[in-house]
Structures are given as structure tokens and as C-alpha cells.
Amino acid sequence: MNAPNVPVLMYHHVTPAGGMIAATPDVFEAQVSRLARAGYQSLSAAQFAAYLAGGAVPERSVLITFDDGYLNNWVHAHPVLARHGMRAVLFTITGWIGDGPVRAHAGQGGPLPATPDHDACKQLVAAGRADEAMLRWSEIEAMQAAGTFEFLSLIHI
């Protein structure tokens, strides 16, 4: 059966810092867990585009999206999505993505990198310290390989 409509959940941040356009890790865990327990399947961008064009998708479908490409998407969102077999579409600001090795995430245990709130992230980027707030290409590759995130470009600054 085809879904009559598909909910779209849009996030920027999953961080203990919280904020207006953020979910805390506990809230994000609860939301994704509830979707998974209810039998929802997360869609890819191509599946959602096909649905918008009249194509069929499972009755319990959801599109989970993230904007910009913040470090906390790797640190806190990636492990939750992996744990529940869900995926999200991340629209990156490619000019803010950096190089370097993969940093720790919450699914590994041990110390985690700081994941500041939205305003602090904007300040870090403006100060030329984007690596403290944004993803690295190595983390993008790891999330893509794990199947937790699909990446599209939002903009290049």
C-alpha cells in the first residue's frame, strides 16, 4: 500500500546544548526509536522524489533530513540512526566541510568532541574555526559507508 502522506523531520543539530533548531541526544533517540518501533522506514532522497512524482513508498515512510553538516550529526545522530536501522539525508554546506581524521562518536564510548549550540557554531565558522563545529570529509565518508546518511549539497560558501 502507498503512504497517503510522508512526514518530513528536519534537523540541524543533535547536541546536549539543545536550542531552537536542535534536539538533545535523548530526545532524538526517543524520536527515532519510536519511529522504528512503529515500523517506519526512512526514505532516501530518490525515494522521496519518486513519491512526490506519484511513485509508491511503504505505508509507514518518513524522510529524515539534516541541514548544513554540523559535527554533532556525526557525534550524536549517526550512532542513533545506526542503532535503529534508519537513515537521513544531509544537505551540506560544502565550503564548511574540512579535512582530517574521523573524530569519536557517542556509539564508541570515551571522550567526545564538543558539540556547541547553533549560535556558537555560527561564531566558530565566522572566526575561521569551522573544524570545531562542522563535519570532516572522513566523517561524511564513514556515515555514507555505514548507510546512516546520504549527502546532497545545500550550498557552497
PLM regions and their residue ranges:
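Conserved small/polar residues in nucleotide/adenosyl-binding loops
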Residues: I155-I157
